[in-house]
Amino acid sequence: MGCGLLAAGLLLFTWLPAGCLSLLVTVQHTERYVTLFASVTLKCDYTTSAQLQDVVVTWRFKSFCKDPIFDYFSASYQAALSLGQDPSNDCSDNQREVRIVAQRRGQSEPVLGVDYRQRKITIQNRADLVINEVMWWDHGVYYCTIEAPGDTSGDPDKEVKLIVLHWLTVIFIILGALLLLLLIGVCWCQCCPQYCCCYIRCPCCPTRCCCPEEALARHRYMKQVQALGPQMMEKPLYWGADRSSQVSSYAMNPLLQRDLSLQSSLPQMPMTQMAAHPPVANGVLEYLEKELRNLNPAQPLPADLRAKSGHPCSMLSSLGSAEVVERRVIHLPPLIRDPPSSRTSNPSHQQRLNAVSSRHCDLSERPRQRHHSDFLRELQDQGMRPWAPGRGELDPHWSGRHHRSRPSESSMPWSDWDSLSECPSSSEAPWPPRRPEPREGAQRRERRRHRSYSPPLPSGPSSWSSEEEKESLPRNWGAQRRHHHRRRRSQSPNWPEEKPPSYRSLDVTPGKNNRKKGNVERRLERESSHSGRSVVI
């Protein structure tokens, strides 16, 4: 009986240490949420009676049976949850993927699994698993298993669910791309405001940006055009050549006198002002170019612009800086040898006769001037005078028969000295020049005096001089001129009261010659039917 009691006590003593030293594994979190490319640490700890160098720690990976994120709202998942089951982990290993992540014995270095050798994974402390740069396929259930020799009882493993939010990472990537595009757009708008209107300062392009340099330069130019636009539209611009070129070409080439007179008689067209600024800021340059292309200088001036402009500007006054521009029109008398009746009867015959006589006079102008100067010199040497002394009428000896033989001939405007007597018509044959006799010269001069009322040429300024030339003369010039005329009147005959000059000058000066211009124009219109040639200066 004593031996039986001893055996029972020995059995009880051996059982108690074995129950107290059984294996126990614990984990801190059963679920962990992590984003893609993040780092995570899965905590695991254990207690055992075995030696630490003999303990083997193993981390296994098992994929989810059903995804706890995408399959959470499915009917099967919700039904399993209602029954108290875990649909994400309640399946056999044959239905999911199983991998060994890492394994370590005692305090030695961990050994990674075949699928994780290129990964940054390690085991720290007693049994903590550290994963750097979590990938999307790390999404699953991790089991921490402890193997200790001699410990056959207890719970040797615990599970931890690692939920990788890879879909959230994808969303973050998409949002980041959108933010990047928005940032690029803000920078684009800040540097290239001709495409959009953004008022957010962007530090990515303080001086340069990705927009084209041509578009940026064009935008700056359009800003300058908009700033200078109102100043350019204040006064109209006129078309035509400059003043210096017109004057020089007119002086060098007399054939341009007729064209210049026609151009000066027509009012110049100002540039058509823009009705309104274009609504789009970047179309100002195109609008200006379109207006310049569509501009027609030949079209008439609008009524409103005509009322504003007042009198039309000529070719010279519209472009030059001078405010007063003078234009003189000189009308020359006709070169006609027919009586007045034939002159008024057939105008076409008069024009042909003028052309023939003027052409012949131009050819024989120089010989006639030379013979006339010789005749006057000879007449002065002989002391012969065609006027009677002390009287203002012609000497009867010089009047002769010629004055009585042509008493009915009407007076006509004075022309060139020898154009009426020595220029033959087309039907007459030319004769060689000869020196006239003194009596013949006196009779011819008396006949010319009877035809014309023009006095001798004065010594002062000519009748067609401008107002500026008259103003430039000294103030006592009038008294000197009257004294000079009294001296000449004592030596020359008294001319009639009405002695219209043959050369008329029309001074067109805006502002100060308006009253004088009316009388001169009326007298000019009455004599314009008798003039044969007009010259515009």
Swiss-Prot record:
Biased composition (Polar residues): 341-357
Disulfide bonds: C44-C144
Highest taxon, organism lineage: Eukaryota
Extracellular side: 23-166
Range of residues in the leader sequence: 1-22
Functional note: Maintains epithelial barrier function by recruiting MARVELD2/tricellulin to tricellular tight junctions (tTJs). Crucial for normal hearing by maintaining the structural and functional integrity of tTJs, which are critical for the survival of auditory neurosensory HCs. Mediates fatty acids and lipoproteins-stimulated CCK/cholecystokinin secretion in the small intestine. In the inner ear, may regulate alternative pre-mRNA splicing via binding to TRA2A, TRA2B and SRSF1.
Protein name: Immunoglobulin-like domain-containing receptor 1
Naturally occurring in which organism (per UniProt): Mus musculus (Mouse)
